[in-house]
């Protein structure tokens, strides 16, 4: 048929005859001379055929998996991935529980005797003299540098992961905010994630840590506790420590609410300062006995609710216990307590976060009061927990605004700022120059002179 008639197909011959003839079965022109294809091309063709076979097999497997079911022919990789997920979930469940598989030989916690007074540790006496001697013997560790008291900021969070992933993200933002402030103002910082005393968990965990830091760092003059849900929002403002020369505890509050109304919110323990001295150790010893979890804390809660105005019925918390202690033993303690309200050592978030734009328009950082709050405290939000007193979305948006409001003050030195108080993205706010030092002189917070706090009537 046409040109095809000029071709014929040779039959396969036996191996012996083929070898004898020196030919392979092929298609060739009738009567023509056989010209075998180049060896390289033949190998390439064979290789292509193998690749096509493998590809077809792979496609077939995919079709079968999609048709019969996703679990058909589960690969080893799928099994490994599933095992990783299960192991991760198991570890998270273990971490969130109170049990520790490594503590199998540890005896269970015994209930504390309600008739015994709980203590934080051995009674420390003459601490002021011992500390003074230590400072004299260790001149390389002064408690004052250039006339400025050495301060250590203590904060922290529970040792377990948050109940929701976004909570861990905001804990990270919170500690970043605190690190920025401490770096700018030459303050040391300790982030604690350990419960040093099993009996004092939750709100009370700060007490044993404060005591331990005092005794382990005699060179520190002030220990400053700050909750993880509190953010610095005035990065320029500095606490006027010289104002507290004759006091050992500085805490935000209102004397009228404390003494006249005996309110359970007269003081706030989300941010306060303790001087490293014998008086502070004695106050911690007097404060702690209401804290042990279980029957002691529950019974103490009933006493606090009965004696403090507006307090709901729940177990004893550290804030209510301190207020009750200062009221019931006023003559013993109040002389050395400074109840501060001239600036926001604690600023309740609800009345502040929606006014940040107005503050930026009218005022400037460094004021520390309602015009530009020093600290914005998200009381009741509990970003790390599974419940809160306020809507989660409202809390998270407000925390984002507070963080970015403060972060803009830090980024300004570098020529950047957030696109908006709800945006994590940043934008350039000025062009770079060949004379960068003029911006250091102008925008470096460390070169800002702190404003003097004037007493208000």
Curated annotation (Swiss-Prot):
EC number per UniProt: 2.4.2.39, 2.4.-.-
Q: Indicate the enzyme's highest-level EC class.
A: transferase
- A single GO cellular-component term on record: Golgi membrane
Q: How does it sit in the membrane?
A: Single-pass type II membrane protein
Q: What is its main location?
A: Golgi
Q: Which residues cross the membrane?
A: 52-71
**Reactions listed under catalytic activity:** Transfers an alpha-D-xylosyl residue from UDP-D-xylose to a glucose residue in xyloglucan, forming an alpha-(1->6)-D-xylosyl-D-glucose linkage
Cellular localization per UniProt = Golgi apparatus membrane
Keywords (alphabetical) are: Glycoprotein, Glycosyltransferase, Golgi apparatus, Membrane, Signal-anchor, Transferase, Transmembrane, Transmembrane helix
Give residue ranges on the Cytoplasmic side. Answer: 1-51
Q: Which GO terms describe its molecular function?
A: xyloglucan 6-xylosyltransferase activity
Q: Where is this region: Disordered?
A: 1-40
Kindly report every residue range on the membrane side named Lumenal: 72-457
Give the positions annotated as glycosylation sites: 115, 431
What processes in GO biological process is this protein linked to?
Answer: xyloglucan metabolic process
Record-stated family: Belongs to the glycosyltransferase 34 family.
What protein does this entry describe? Probable xyloglucan 6-xylosyltransferase 3
Give the organism, scientific name: Arabidopsis thaliana
């Amino acid at each position: 048929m046409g040109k095809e008639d000029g071709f014929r197909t040779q039959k396969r011959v036996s191996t012996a005859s083929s070898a004898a003839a020196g030919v392979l079965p092929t298609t060739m022109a009738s009567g023509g001379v056989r010209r075998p294809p180049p060896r390289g091309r033949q190998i390439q063709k064979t290789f292509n055929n193998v690749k096509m076979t493998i590809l077809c097999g792979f496609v077939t497997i995919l079709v079968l998996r999609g048709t019969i079911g996703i679990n058909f022919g589960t690969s080893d990789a799928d099994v490994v991935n599933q095992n990783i997920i299960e192991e991760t979930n198991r570890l998270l469940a273990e971490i969130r529980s109170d049990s520790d598989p490594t503590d199998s030989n540890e005896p269970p916690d015994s209930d504390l005797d309600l008739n015994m007074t709980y203590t934080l540790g051995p009674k420390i006496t003459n601490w002021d003299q011992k500390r003074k001697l230590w400072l004299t013997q260790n001149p390389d560790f002064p408690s004052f540098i250039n006339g400025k008291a050495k301060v250590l900021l203590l904060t922290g969070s529970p040792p377990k992961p948050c109940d929701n992933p976004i909570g861990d993200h905001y804990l990270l933002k919170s500690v970043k905010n605190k690190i920025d402030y401490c770096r700018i103002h030459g303050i040391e910082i300790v982030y604690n994630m350990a419960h040093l005393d099993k009996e004092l968990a939750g709100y009370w965990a700060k007490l044993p840590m404060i005591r331990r830091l005092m005794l382990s760092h005699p060179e520190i003059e002030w220990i400053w506790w700050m909750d993880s849900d509190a953010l610095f929002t005035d990065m320029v403002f500095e606490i006027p420590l010289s104002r507290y020369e004759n006091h050992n505890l500085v805490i935000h509050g209102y004397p009228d609410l404390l003494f006249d109304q005996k309110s359970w919110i007269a003081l706030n323990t989300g941010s306060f300062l303790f001087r490293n001295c014998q008086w502070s150790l004695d106050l911690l010893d007097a404060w702690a006995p209401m804290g042990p979890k279980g029957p002691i804390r529950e019974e103490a809660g009933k006493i606090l609710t009965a004696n403090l105005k507006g307090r709901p019925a729940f177990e004893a918390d550290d804030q209510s216990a301190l207020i009750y202690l200062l009221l019931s033993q006023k003559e013993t303690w109040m002389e050395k307590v400074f109840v501060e309200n001239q600036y926001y050592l604690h600023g309740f978030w609800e009345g502040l976060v929606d006014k940040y734009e107005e503050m930026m328009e009218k005022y400037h950082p460094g004021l520390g009061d309602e015009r530009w709050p020093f600290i914005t405290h998200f009381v009741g939000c509990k970003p790390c927990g599974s419940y809160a007193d306020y809507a989660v979305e409202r809390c998270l948006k407000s925390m984002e605004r507070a963080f970015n409001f403060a972060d803009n003050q830090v980024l300004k030195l570098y020529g950047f700022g957030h696109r908006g108080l709800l945006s994590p993205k940043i934008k350039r706010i000025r062009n770079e120059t060949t004379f960068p030092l003029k911006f250091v002189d102008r925008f470096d917070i460390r070169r800002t002179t702190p404003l003097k706090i004037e007493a208000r009537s």
